[in-house]
């Protein structure tokens, strides 16, 4: 039996934990995100705080240790839509339903914001694609 997972919304005070997980995700999965380790690692503390202040970012924790992140933002391309970005779970904690739980929680956030759609981007070769498909997302080719 696995330890229970707790999801909570990150605050700007969580920037160090968020930064560590975000940089690790960019290091271990450089093709999975719309940014790079080189672009984000030199950013100042205030930049990281600002990201958390202007988004709905979740921290997934097991025994008080952050093991995953997922962010909901206003869709940059479509008014009234929300977008899931930067979803990532530490490799040793995958397969426990953490990503699915974050997706479901972010979907509730989007519905509460009266979003008419939830979008995300994932490459064809990304193993996370299966998680999104099981959560009901469909490829649009965009």
Indicate residue ranges for each PLM-predicted region.
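Acetyl-CoA-dependent GNAT
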Residues: 12-92, 103-105, 109, 113
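Extreme N-terminal starter segment of soluble prokaryotic enzymes
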Residues: 4-7
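Short glycine/proline-centered loop/turn elements that form peptide/ligand docking sites
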Residues: 99, 103, 123-128
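Conserved GNAT acetyl-CoA-binding A-motif
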Residues: 110-123
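Flexible nucleotide-binding loop
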Residues: 96
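Conserved acetyl-CoA-binding loop of GNAT-fold acetyltransferases
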Residues: 133-142
């Amino acid at each position: 039996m696995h330890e229970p997972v707790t999801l909570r919304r990150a605050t700007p005070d969580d920037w160090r934990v968020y930064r560590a997980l975000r940089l690790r995700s960019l290091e271990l999965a450089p093709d999975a995100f719309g940014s790079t380790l080189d672009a984000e690692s030199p950013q100042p503390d205030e930049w990281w705080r600002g990201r958390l202040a202007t988004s709905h970012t979740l921290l997934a924790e097991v025994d008080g240790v952050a093991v995953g992140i997922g962010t909901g933002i206003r869709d940059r391309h479509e008014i009234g839509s929300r977008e899931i970005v930067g979803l990532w779970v530490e490799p040793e904690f995958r397969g426990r339903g953490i990503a699915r739980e974050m997706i479901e929680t972010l979907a509730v956030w989007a519905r509460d914001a009266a979003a008419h759609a939830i979008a995300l981007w994932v490459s064809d070769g990304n193993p996370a694609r299966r998680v999104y498909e099981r959560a009901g997302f469909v490829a649009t080719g965009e």
